[in-house]
Swiss-Prot record:
Keyword tags: ATP-binding, Ligase, Nucleotide-binding
Family (UniProt): Belongs to the ATP-dependent AMP-binding enzyme family.
CDD domains for the chain: ACS
Any one of the GO BP annotations: acetyl-CoA biosynthetic process from acetate
GO CC terms of this entry: cytosol
Reactions catalysed: acetate + ATP + CoA = acetyl-CoA + AMP + diphosphate
EC annotation from Swiss-Prot or TrEMBL: 6.2.1.1
Organism of this sequence: Debaryomyces hansenii (strain ATCC 36239 / CBS 767 / BCRC 21394 / JCM 1990 / NBRC 0083 / IGC 2968) (Yeast)
Protein name: Acetyl-coenzyme A synthetase 1
A GO term, aspect molecular function: acetate-CoA ligase activity
One Pfam family here: AMP-binding_C
Gene for this chain: ACS1
Length: 671
């Protein structure tokens, strides 16, 4: 063991090979033949990125004007050296909308592009590629008529309905830039993002539906626009048809009325490879919003390649990503990735628990979903509900099960594998970021061996390095722990923070010179598999021991009574920091709570060691989470620090009411 070794890599299960049934369930030949093919391609993507990605770009994308060279500079030796990011597909021109829609509409106009499952059961519709093209073209004409031109920003505040996809594709069809704001953000957060992106138009709905509840979407927009004088129009889709929705004459326009004015075709506007495609503001940040900017060609290639290789997507597949278009997962694996591959994408408006815990599995069987992609948070919820909600479903169309958003605990991995995959699907635990645009670490479906809890191996072009967090020295051997960085540029990397490139350099390129800094701790085990240990600011330093919160959480969840947990650090006079564990128990627990606390401490001592023992265990009803499923550890830290008045905007939480209960629990421990 090296001085930087990590306990999380002590995997007792060994390497799990892809199931033999994976290939049997596929209607098409797998996109990669074997692991040797991946290894050869990966090596070339690192050693000769210009040649590798040049060939991939010609294979996966249609070009209006061919690029002169795939990468400038051709060599990656000086990447990130002076805050510079390589340019990709120099002098090439293309259009994202054409690549995602037109070429498939021409080939097979009657093929389903979007399957829409509404919040209400048995409501929804199927949109073919031919119909999608018509809708996109009509909206593109509408936006042009309203004065939107190439490079302009359009704010999108829409729920998970097909019109969200139509909107994004129409915006990029005319060379404009979409800035999607998750339709759960408060009016204040929406206002900040509209102002920062200088958006001229907002596209939204009268109301939205989620989990059986009606959300007053338009009222939130109206409140935000009180302080956005440069917004000229609001385009309003009629989702519920509430006749009492506020409507501002001269500014507000009805979607259906505007769409009826235009014909079924509008030519796509070619843009340069490096022209911006979209802005997406990262969630959970404090202070000024951080608008991550992505380029057109590089992002599209990343979305297409990772969909094809990570998920083994083919044109005859149906991909169900249980994510929202307001986050990067929705952008890449609900919208662009599946459509760039000519597949069918499922757009689900609801929640996994409405009207009951069978909703996901009902959708899978109903539409013969082949790839399912979801956050571990949802899986924990469904595991707690019990297998009775799964037993009546075949789920035999599935061949790939994806996990996204946070590391998946081994216990949840096995539950997923046994109950949803029936041990016949390949589980791909993916690691990536808003800033990366597409997968960074992930198994490739049907190809890569896996270990429960590990993100496996780097994707093409990701020259992953683990650095010593203090010295910045690369830890080249296996069985090491440090910070995860990337040595060279890849096509889908963010091109910066909108209007603040200096902040981009400070955040991602300056901490470890000549590297992109992910912000995450990671380990590479004895077999070369990568494990994500959580954000570096989620690492707790107790008496000189650097403890990964993810590692402690993985130990706690082994206890049979634990449904969810989150570990954070807090100030301690003796040890510098101490470990606090917020624990949510399963609903059927009858055991004495003090006994459970003692058992949890023993579990951590057994799995990791005495130095990792939580000093405080707080039993709470639930944990604060965003709608995308991420646990908001920032809130948990602030409550522990007695900073309840500095929590910021909690309106984006899926369960904001839980914060008050958590505050009460913490206060009770101080008495």
């Amino acid at each position: 063991m090296t001085p930087h070794s990590t306990h999380v890599t002590l995997d007792h299960e060994g390497i799990i090979q892809p199931p033999a049934e994976f290939k049997e369930r596929s209607k098409s030949k797998p996109n990669l033949a074997d692991f040797e093919t991946y290894s050869k391609m990966y090596k070339e993507s690192i050693e000769n990125p210009s040649k590798f990605f040049g060939e991939q770009a010609l294979e996966h994308l249609s070009w209006d004007r061919p690029f002169d060279e795939a990468r400038y500079p051709v060599s990656s030796e000086q990447d990130f050296a002076d805050g510079d990011i390589a340019s990709w597909f120099v002098n090439g021109q293309l259009n994202a909308s054409y690549n995602a829609v037109d070429r498939w509409a021409i080939k097979n106009p009657n093929k389903p592009a979007i399957i829409y499952e509404a919040d209400e059961e048995n409501e929804g519709r199927i949109i073919t590629y031919g119909q999608l093209l018509k809708d996109v073209c009509k909206l593109a004409q509408c936006l042009t008529k309203l004065g939107i031109r190439k490079g302009d920003s359009v704010a999108v505040y829409l729920p998970m309905i097909p019109e969200a996809l139509v909107t994004l594709l129409a915006i990029v069809r005319i060379g404009a830039v979409h800035s999607v704001v998750f339709a759960g953000f408060s009016s204040s957060s929406l206002k900040d993002r509209i102002l920062d992106a200088s958006s001229k138009i907002v596209i939204t709905t009268d109301e939205s539906k989620r989990g059986g509840k009606t959300i007053e979407t338009k009222k939130i927009v109206d409140d935000a626009l009180k302080n956005c004088p440069d917004v000229t129009n609001v385009l309003l889709f009629k989702r519920t048809g509430n006749a009492h929705i506020p409507f501002t004459e001269g500014r507000d326009l009805w979607w259906h009325e505007e769409m009826a004015k235009y014909g079924p075709y509008f030519p796509p506007v070619p843009v340069n490879s490096e022209d911006p495609l979209f802005l997406l503001y990262t969630s959970g940040s404090t202070g000024k919003p951080k608008g991550i900017q992505h380029s057109t060609a590089g992002y599209l290639l990343g979305a297409a390649m990772t969909s094809k290789y990570t998920f083994d997507v083919h044109e005859d597949d149906v991909l169900f990503t249980a994510g929202d278009v307001g986050w990067i997962t929705g952008h890449t694996y609900v919208v662009y990735g599946p459509l760039l591959c000519g597949a069918t994408t499922v757009v689900f408006e609801g929640t996994p628990a409405h009207p009951n815990y069978s909703r996901y599995w009902e959708i899978v069987d109903k539409y013969q979903v082949t790839q399912f992609y979801v956050a571990p948070t949802a899986l924990r919820l469904l595991k707690r509900a019990g297998t009775k909600y799964i037993e009546n479903y075949k789920l035999d169309s599935l061949r790939v099960l994806g996990s996204v958003g946070e590391p998946i605990a081994a216990e949840i991995w096995h539950w997923y594998n046994d109950n949803i995959g029936r041990r016949k699907c390949h589980i791909v635990d993916t690691y990536w970021q808003t800033e990366s645009g597409s997968h960074m670490l992930a198994p490739l479906a049907g190809i890569t061996p896996t270990k429960p809890g590990s993100a496996s191996l780097p994707c093409f072009g990701i020259d992953a390095k683990i650095l010593d967090p203090v010295s910045g020295k690369e830890l080249k051997e296996n069985d090491v722990e440090g910070v995860l960085c990337v040595k060279s540029c890849w096509p889908s990397i963010s091109r910066g923070i909108y209007n603040d490139y200096a902040r981009f350099i400070e955040t991602y390129l300056k901490p470890y010179p000549n590297h992109y800094f992910s912000g995450d701790g990671a380990a590479r085990d004895v077999d070369g598999f990568y494990w994500i240990l959580g954000r570096v600011d989620d690492v707790v330093n107790v008496s000189g021991h650097r403890l990964s919160t993810a590692e402690i959480e993985a130990a706690l969840i082994l206890h049979e009574s634990v449904a969810e947990c989150a570990v954070v650090g807090y100030a301690d006079e003796l040890t510098g920091q101490a470990v606090a564990a917020y624990v949510s128990l399963k609903s059927n627990v009858s055991e004495d709570l003090e006994v459970i606390k003692k058992e949890l401490i023993l579990t951590v001592r057994k799995e990791i060691g005495p130095f990792a023992t939580p000093k405080t265990i707080l039993l709470v009803d639930d944990l604060p989470k965003t709608r995308s499923g991420k646990i908001m550890r920032r809130i948990l830290r602030k409550v522990l620090a007695g900073e309840e008045d500095q929590l910021g905007d909690i309106s984006t939480l899926s369960n904001p009411g839980v914060v008050a209960q958590i505050i009460d629990v913490v206060k009770a421990t101080r008495k």
